[in-house]
Amino acid sequence: MSKMAEQKAAAVDGLGGAGAADAAPAGEAAAARVRPVETLLRAAPLGLCVAAMTVMLRDQQSNEYGTVAYSDLGGFKYLVYANGLCAAYSLVSAFYTAVPRPATVSRSWVVFLLDQVFTYLILAAGAAAAELLYLAYNGDKEVTWSEACGVFGSFCRQARTSVAITFGTVLCFILLSLISSYRLFSAYEAPPSSALGSKGVEIAAYPR
């Protein structure tokens, strides 16, 4: 009986090893199929960032009441800087993704963290600029700020276009963050039942 049990265990181990060997090429093939799609997704924010930055840089209006430009408002300047940084990151990350390389947990962590940083960066820039636009259109009676878009309508419309494009960039970066987070955390196995402590506390599993 013991010999039969040992033979069965050896057979199971052999099947497991073969399955693991087959899984590696399958995983590499799947990554090769997904790579062009992810490369395009990472390149898409580049055009949006450049468009939003260009529209805002050209935003200026002069009339009998005076002259106003994007550089007069800190929130709009932050929007320009954030779009410039995100455009550079989009270009670099697209090239990085396009080049085939073995996936490692450390690389997945780097991409995940950078995606998070730039997602929050562009989100904060869009939110700050949107708040400025709200005040420009509606004013603030609490501090006796009057609305300005009735006087500088062209300036406000151009700024609104730039902010709208920026929020399109935000959606792209959110999608990229979801992809990189899935790739990272799918590299970790769920803890087996034996990893539960006596008090039902789970012990973190090691990466594959």
Curated annotation (Swiss-Prot):
Q: Which UniProt keywords apply?
A: Cell membrane, Membrane, Transmembrane, Transmembrane helix
Positions in the Cytoplasmic compartment: 1-36, 100-108, 183-208
List, alphabetically, the GO terms of the cellular component aspect: plasma membrane
The record's subcellular location field reads:
Cell membrane
Pfam families hit by this protein: CASP_dom
The topology of this chain with respect to the membrane is:
Multi-pass membrane protein
Q: Which family, according to UniProt?
A: Belongs to the Casparian strip membrane proteins (CASP) family.
This protein's assembly is summarised as: Homodimer and heterodimers.
Q: What is this protein called?
A: CASP-like protein 2A1
Record organism:
Sorghum bicolor (Sorghum)
